[in-house]
Amino acid sequence: MVNDIIADSLTRIRNAAMRRLDYTTLYYAKIVVSILEVFLAKGFIESYKVIDKDGKQSINVVLKYDEKGRSVISEIKRISKSGRRVYKGRDELKRFKNGYGTIVVSTSKGVIGNEEAYKANVGGEALCSIW
């Protein structure tokens, strides 16, 4: 069993992108699906699909590459960890990497990107960053 399913999912995506794989498979969790929704909306992944096989669910993530075959994901990091939670206020979420990156934030309005959190005037737990 994985202790930190978010960190495991981010590592699987990072490793698959470095190896230039077409897709990768992640363990299923609602929080992971919410994070993938943000990645999809921001254009960091092509698509994802929840697979139910023998009563166990998993997620297939199709990675996205540019026309030269390079991954659109330069770096992906876990910010808030189980031993050290990191919270960001509204003003700390305005821009990240000059708008090229996104901080995924768990707020009272759900799991959203940093720009949406800034516009909604909410802060929350910074789950991960991607650029």
Swiss-Prot record:
SUPFAM superfamilies: Ribosomal protein S8. GO terms for biological process: translation. Disulfide bonds: none annotated. Coiled coil: none annotated. InterPro entries: Ribosomal_uS8 (IPR000630), Ribosomal_uS8_CS (IPR047863), Ribosomal_uS8_sf (IPR035987). The keyword Ribosomal protein applies. GO terms for cellular component: ribonucleoprotein complex; ribosome. GO terms for molecular function: rRNA binding; structural constituent of ribosome. Keywords: Ribonucleoprotein, Ribosomal protein, RNA-binding, rRNA-binding. One of the primary rRNA binding proteins, it binds directly to 16S rRNA central domain where it helps coordinate assembly of the platform of the 30S subunit. Belongs to the universal ribosomal protein uS8 family. Part of the 30S ribosomal subunit. Contacts proteins S5 and S12. This is Small ribosomal subunit protein uS8. It comes from Wolinella succinogenes (strain ATCC 29543 / DSM 1740 / CCUG 13145 / JCM 31913 / LMG 7466 / NCTC 11488 / FDC 602W) (Vibrio succinogenes). The lineage of its organism: Bacteria, Pseudomonadati, Campylobacterota, Epsilonproteobacteria, Campylobacterales.
